[in-house]
Swiss-Prot record:
GO terms for molecular function: metal ion binding; racemase and epimerase activity, acting on amino acids and derivatives. The keyword Metal-binding applies. PANTHER family: D-GALACTONATE DEHYDRATASE-RELATED, ENOLASE SUPERFAMILY MEMBER DDB_G0284701. Binds 1 Mg(2+) ion per subunit. It comes from Pedosphaera parvula (strain Ellin514). Substrate binds at K156, L157, K158, K259, D309, I310, D311. This is L-Ala-D/L-amino acid epimerase.
């Protein structure tokens, strides 16, 4: 097996700001691309989309990948390959995700199947709907963003800043009755303030749920207190990394948001979704700012999800890959350039 890897800068259509970084909005982000090639010429693609929230970076991810001995990786034995990768260092979930996705891409190609069939899940084109994210911004910019996102039936509004009420009002001026999911990104610091904001949001009958209302390291009793009183469902994002977090999240939330960059890849995300479902939690799969490699990888798990928020590639202007599409928010592989593996190809 040979491995190649490189950084890829992604330009954002709008400056991206969320509650955990309200002072440092960005208009460019960087991801790491991984390409594995075996002796038969089978290629597997992967992507690392690290988050500063988890003390990871693209340079750090690529440094980790540089330490991987590709001769110890095999499309024919993903479990052993990942056991080796895990042994190299703790953490580094984004980098491990890139390798896991590339391994599954290659394995599915060799099996003559797309990944969703390799996993036994299948995929229904034009059935799953992704939300489209609106970052924290000035009210007039929010209005313009919402109008530009007219084709998407569901929006996700980032909150947790001083202008939350003005921003929701601006969204509603442009889209009075569109379904909205609200993501506080740990922005409400006390249970009382969080409940006050959620009760205000619940007056809007077209809001579906609230994501990560309080910091993940809050006292679990405070989050459970909030869950018991919240008029809207609560989803844990920063609180749910892997399947090991399920007991805590079952006490504190109604659902969880799984991301490949948090779990360490498709294999662990599959487990995290299955375990959450068995615990009675609603499930969603989310993303960071990513190319179509990682967005498509997440889409292969759609059949395990109640909700999807995989729009990271739609927020960029220079996605270098083609894969799953989201016309009018409906996910589809019907026009994907590849039939096997991730069903992704470079433009």
């Amino acid at each position: 097996m040979q491995i190649k890897f490189w950084p890829q800068d992604l330009k954002l259509a709008h400056t991206w700001t969320i509650a955990s970084s309200v002072t440092s909005g960005s208009d460019v982000t960087s991801v790491g691309i991984v390409q594995l090639t075996d002796r038969d010429g089978t290629v597997g693609l992967g992507e690392a989309a690290p988050a500063r929230r988890y003390n990871e970076s693209t340079p750090g991810s690529l440094d980790f990948i540089a330490k991987v001995d590709a001769t110890k990786l095999s499309f024919d034995n993903i479990e052993a390959s990942m056991k080796y990768v895990e042994s190299l260092a703790s953490g580094q979930f984004a980098a491990k995700s890139a390798i896991n996705v590339a391994l599954l891409d290659g394995a599915a190609r060799k099996a003559g199947k797309p990944i969703y069939d390799l996993l036994g899940l299948g995929f229904r084109n034009n059935h799953h709907v992704t939300s489209f994210s609106i970052g924290i911004d000035k009210a007039d910019v929010i209005r313009k963003k919402v109008l530009a996102a007219e084709q998407y039936p569901v929006l996700k509004l980032k909150v947790g800043a001083a202008d939350d009420k003005a921003n929701l009002a601006a969204l509603r001026e442009a889209a009075p009755q569109k379904w909205v999911r609200v993501d506080a990104n740990e922005g409400w610091k006390t249970k009382e303030h969080a409940l006050e904001m959620i009760e205000w949001l619940a007056q809007d009958k077209f809001i579906q749920y609230i994501e990560q209302p309080m910091p993940a390291d809050s006292n679990p009793k405070d989050i459970a207190w909030l869950k018991a009183r919240s008029p809207l469902p609560l989803f844990g994002d920063e609180s749910y990394h892997t399947a090991k977090d399920v007991d805590h999240c079952a006490e504190c939330y109604h659902g969880v948001n799984v991301k490949l960059c948090k779990t360490g890849g498709i294999s662990n995300a599959y487990e995290a979704l299955q375990v959450a479902r068995k615990a009675g939690l609603k499930t969603m799969i989310g993303c960071m700012i990513e190319t179509s490699i990682l967005i498509s990888a997440a889409a292969h798990l759609a059949e395990l999800c109640d909700y999807l928020d995989i729009d990271g590639n739609l927020l960029t202007t220079n996605d270098p890959y083609l894969g799953v599409t989201a016309e009018k928010g409906l996910l589809s592989f019907a026009s994907a350039p590849e039939k096997l593996g991730l069903r992704v190809r470079a433009k």
